[in-house]
């Protein structure tokens, strides 16, 4: 299957009309979209280490969640870290496609996976663009018990918690940066909101708002989507070599 054919097939499953207006995703770069894809690498972020690994391991295609190019490039020179990666990729005939907010929204994508991992039942979309998911746990938990459970399930280095001193049962999730969805989660009836990033100012008001808040890390709340991409590629071409690579560059010391 060629790069172009593969992208078109993936767009049938992750439609372009799900993309947020401010977002930039799609086929990010390709020297030849008619090139056959035999070896693919899946990652959350296209870091320079990921690019170098792809070059040294004869990868034809990188599929990422976060866009390789987010802000417009005014020039393509090796003075820019983004342009430098694009140059390397083009020189080595490696294509990149990214899916970002449409993979957040799509059925079976980032937020459905996150809800499933956390044991949230009957999860339904909520919030602007219906990006988030909200549902209920099978049993009520204390905030402390749920926080430790979540930390283990997501394999987090640690989580930030702001406790409204209420039990946890109706839980809303938004992978990545979800601070703008706290109000929508509260309006939808959530007693607890989980996201990758919420921020100090919002978390400081959790008690006053009457909602438990857990900040579990951008990477840890979105990394599971790599398995979603892997499954899609394997179904489209069972003979394709597909590898997932961890791109987390942030450490908790």
Feature-to-residue mapping (PLM):
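Active-site catalytic microenvironments in core metabolic enzymes, especially phosphate/sugar-handling
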Residues: 1-253
């Amino acid at each position: 299957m060629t790069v172009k054919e593969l992208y078109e097939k993936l767009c049938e499953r992750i439609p372009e009309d799900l993309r947020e207006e401010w977002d930039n995703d799609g086929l990010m770069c390709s020297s030849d979209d008619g090139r056959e894809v035999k070896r693919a690498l899946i990652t959350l972020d296209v870091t320079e280490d990921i690019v170098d690994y792809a070059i040294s391991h004869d990868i034809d295609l990188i599929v990422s969640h976060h866009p390789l190019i987010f802000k417009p490039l005014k020039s393509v020179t090796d003075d820019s870290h983004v342009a430098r990666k694009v140059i390397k990729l083009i020189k080595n005939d490696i294509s990149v496609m990214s899916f970002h907010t449409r993979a957040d929204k799509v059925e079976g994508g980032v937020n459905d996976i996150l809800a499933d991992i956390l044991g949230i039942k009957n999860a339904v979309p909520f919030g602007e663009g219906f990006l988030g998911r909200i549902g209920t746990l099978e049993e009520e938990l204390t905030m402390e018990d749920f926080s430790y459970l979540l930390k283990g399930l997501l394999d987090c280095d640690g989580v930030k918690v702001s406790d409204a001193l209420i039990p946890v049962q109706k839980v809303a999730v938004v992978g990545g940066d979800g601070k703008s969805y706290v109000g929508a989660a509260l309006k939808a009836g959530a007693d607890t909101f989980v996201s990758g990033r919420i921020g100090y100012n919002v978390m400081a008001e959790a008690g006053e708002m009457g909602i438990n808040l857990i900040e579990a890390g951008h990477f840890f709340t979105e990394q599971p989507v790599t398995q979603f991409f892997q499954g899609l590629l394997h179904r489209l071409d069972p003979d394709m070599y597909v590898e997932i690579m961890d791109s987390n560059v942030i450490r908790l010391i």
